[in-house]
Amino acid sequence: MSVLYPSLEDLKVGQVIQAQARASPMMPTVMPTLPASMASAPPLSELYPNLAELESYMGLSLSSQEVQKNLSQIPDGDNMVITSPGPGQVTAPVSGNDLGVLRAEIKPGVREIHLCKDERGKTGLRLQAVDKGLFVQLVQANTPASLVGLRFGDQILQIDGCDCAGWSTHKAQKALKKASAEKIVMVVRDRPFQRTVTMHKDSSGQVGFFIKKGKIVSVVKGSSAARNGLLTNHYVCEVNGQNVIGLKDKKIIEILTTAGNVITLTIIPTVIYEHMIKKLSPLLLHHTMDHSIPDT
């Protein structure tokens, strides 16, 4: 299994680091005693390969210091071994431990959540049937549904032990209405129709795509968006894990502008998105959808 990277930039920088590490002579296990007249050894952080040539790699404002702070420090001791990332391990020499990447992660597998109703008997959740499956259409802000971490596009596999495959939207809403106010047990799969794309701003603060009414309409040639495979005819669901569905383009651009250098978009194909939100008014999406920044 190959090593995984959040973005193409991370992959390329990681390859440079690994190539330089392999080319560097291995240090002997037993270090000879040096005469006092010789210069002292460089600090351990300088044992990393020289990454100065990456200063403006792929249009990024990328310095050796920025890359090295995202790498594991070499441990103290006489025996030092340079290790490569293991198969299936995610490594991010450029993105580092970016919170946006973590918040946007679409986890594999399924999980169980316990939902309740508020004092009005509401969960703050709307469901929509798509291709014989049941999906989250709307999560209202400051409701039980938002507090348990449900997101637009999550697939509901079971409600209180009943399989939801083949259910209509009406049957799903009826089941929620009849469910206990104290505890509703759901089995959920994270957003199967969506995927994430991690990109990096260039020196002018751009990642290289344009949106119209929340939909990606063009991608700039040679940009980080193009390099990382961002597609047109997809809607932006999240920016760094924050839901932006129903927001005006101006607000989405403001969120992108004020974000850090690493941008992770969660996107969904137009045909799926438009089916998911049919019969929902734009005002409902704009004013009631949970647009808060999720916990990691």
UniProtKB/Swiss-Prot annotation:
Domain PDZ, first and last residues per copy: 112-191, 196-271
GO cellular component terms listed in the entry, alphabetical order: cytoplasm; cytosol; Golgi apparatus; nuclear speck; nucleolus; plasma membrane
Entry keyword annotation includes GTP-binding: no
Record keywords, A-Z: Cell membrane, Cytoplasm, Lipid-binding, Membrane, Nucleus, Repeat
An example Gene Ontology molecular-function term: phosphatidylinositol-4,5-bisphosphate binding
SMART domains, A to Z: PDZ
GO biological process: cell population proliferation
Localization per record: Cytoplasm; Nucleus, Nucleolus; Nucleus, Nucleoplasm; Cell membrane
Domain of life: Eukaryota
Major subcellular site: cytoplasm
InterPro entries: APP-Binding, PDZ, PDZ_sf
Function field: Binds phosphatidylinositol 4,5-bisphosphate (PIP2). May play a role in the organization of nuclear PIP2, cell division and cell survival.
Quaternary context: Monomer and homodimer. Interacts with SDCBP. Interacts with TM4SF1.
UniProt note: domains: The two PDZ domains mediate the interaction with phosphatidylinositol 4,5-bisphosphate (PIP2) and target SDCBP2 to the plasma membranes and nucleoli, PIP2-rich regions.
The name this protein goes by in its record: Syntenin-2
Organism in which the protein naturally occurs: Rattus norvegicus
